[in-house]
Structure formats: C-alpha cells, structure tokens
C-alpha cells in the first residue's frame, strides 16, 4: 500500500494509464482480428482493406508504448504475407 503522497499519486497515475493502455490494446486487437477473419474467409479485397486499416492502429500503439516496434513490425509482416498469398 502506498503511504507517501507521491506514491499515492503514482498509484493513481498507474491505474489511469493501465486503463488507457488496456483500451488501446483491445482496439488494436480488434483491428487485427478483422484482418484474421478476412483472411479466413478467403476474401482478398476485404483482407487488404482490413490490413490497411490495421496498420496505422498498430503503429499508433507503438508510438504510445503499448507494443514494441519489432512486435508490431512482425505482426504486420506476417499478416501482409498471408494476405498476399490469398488468391
């Protein structure tokens, strides 16, 4: 339990930041799931559109510190490769 005033403030800030990051992470995962679903359905047009929508969201997550840049790059690369294979 935080005892000093600054520790109490940090605890409040950490909780607020956690909630913001949780929402941001959830939003990004939703965009990635849409790409996965489009790939699973075999619709290249929808998959490409979903990938284009997901990319800026994922990069925004990197900027905001939710994901590491290499993690985001790896996810985008793997999704792009899977979309490219679709006929």
From Swiss-Prot:
GO biological process: translation
Record protein name field: Small ribosomal subunit protein bS20
GO cellular component: small ribosomal subunit
Function comment: Binds directly to 16S ribosomal RNA.
SUPFAM superfamilies (alphabetical): Ribosomal protein S20
Similarity section: Belongs to the bacterial ribosomal protein bS20 family.
GO MF, any single term: structural constituent of ribosome
Keywords: Ribonucleoprotein, Ribosomal protein, RNA-binding, rRNA-binding
InterPro entries: Ribosomal_bS20, Ribosomal_bS20_sf
Organismal lineage: Bacteria, Pseudomonadati, Pseudomonadota, Alphaproteobacteria, Rhodobacterales
Superkingdom, natural source: Bacteria
Signal peptide residue numbers: none
């Amino acid at each position: 339990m935080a005892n000093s005033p600054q520790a109490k403030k940090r605890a409040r800030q950490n909780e607020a930041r956690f909630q913001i990051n949780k929402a941001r992470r959830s939003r990004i995962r939703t965009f990635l799931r849409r790409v996965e679903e489009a790939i699973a359905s075999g619709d290249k047009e929808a998959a490409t559109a979903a990938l284009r929508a997901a990319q800026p969201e994922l990069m925004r997550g990197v900027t905001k510190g939710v994901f590491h840049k290499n993690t985001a790059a790896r996810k985008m690369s793997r999704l792009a490769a899977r979309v490219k294979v679709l006929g």
